[in-house]
Amino acid sequence: MPLNAVRVASKAQPAKNVILVFHGLGDSGSGWSFLAEYLQRSPAFAHTRFVFPNAPNMRIDANGGMSMPAWFNIYDWANPDARVDVEGIKSSLKVINSFIQEQIDDGISPENIILGGFSQGAALTLASTVTSPYKLGGFFALSGFCRLKKEDLDSIAENKNKDTPVFHGHGDQDPIIPIQYGSDAKKFFEKYFHLSDYDFKSYRGMAHSTSLEEMQDLVQFLSKALKL
């Protein structure tokens, strides 16, 4: 079955790098396709292709059982100790691996692949720093969080990306995923999985969104991670 995604070809051939971006709850791949246009303005990203996967529709308990695009279920927004859809997260981590393998099969080296996401997609990205069987070029998490416990990841941990750079940007006025959830995620992955290159940046006045300042920092991170 073909992998469902919005795909943006590299401006120049052949493609040498790939940036995979997983969207947030209720969104779609097209919601983040602006990132390709933004980055491809720079000649440095001419040989970079972009893939923006689309999540399937599923019932979200925290939204009254409404069906919407999601990578995993959310049971309760307000309670950080609420039930976590561990199996849903693990299932989506397999989807991520399928997208990565697709690019490798097409001749892209793993170290030239960047995995990133926003909100739910960022949560998957952070989990992938531990579970990915591939040594990637970098990870970026925008407004990300982690509600998994160490034991949830232990059984599927690969630990191939302990030294891989991670960029985590978060707004200090985020009403959906409070910035504390973001800083807690950094502590979690550094303490239990010994990530050694985890850069967490907060953005003053930013809500559950992105900003020009964050985008500029992301460009700098991607350029360094891909050696552009």
Curated annotation (Swiss-Prot):
The reaction(s) this protein catalyses: S-hexadecanoyl-L-cysteinyl-[protein] + H2O = L-cysteinyl-[protein] + hexadecanoate + H(+)
Keywords, alphabetical: Cytoplasm, Fatty acid metabolism, Hydrolase, Lipid metabolism, Nucleus, Serine esterase
Entry annotated with the keyword Nucleus: yes
Gene Ontology biological process terms in this record: fatty acid metabolic process
Keyword hit for Hydrolase: yes
Active-site residue list: S119, D174, H208
Record EC number: 3.1.2.-, 3.1.2.22
Assigned GO CC terms: cytoplasm; nucleus
Cell compartments where the protein resides: Cytoplasm; Nucleus
Gene Ontology terms for molecular function: carboxylic ester hydrolase activity; palmitoyl-(protein) hydrolase activity
Pfam families in UniProt: Abhydrolase_2 (PF02230)
InterPro entries named in the record: AB_hydrolase_fold, LYPA1-2/EST-like, PLipase/COase/thioEstase
PANTHER family tied to this protein: LYSOPHOSPHOLIPASE-LIKE PROTEIN 1 (PTHR10655:SF17), LYSOPHOSPHOLIPASE-RELATED (PTHR10655)
Known role: Hydrolyzes fatty acids from S-acylated cysteine residues in proteins with a strong preference for palmitoylated G-alpha proteins over other acyl substrates. Mediates the deacylation of G-alpha proteins such as GPA1 in vivo, but has weak or no activity toward palmitoylated Ras proteins. Has weak lysophospholipase activity in vitro; however such activity may not exist in vivo.
Family: Belongs to the AB hydrolase superfamily. AB hydrolase 2 family.
The protein, known as: Acyl-protein thioesterase 1
Organism for this UniProt entry: Kluyveromyces lactis (strain ATCC 8585 / CBS 2359 / DSM 70799 / NBRC 1267 / NRRL Y-1140 / WM37) (Yeast)
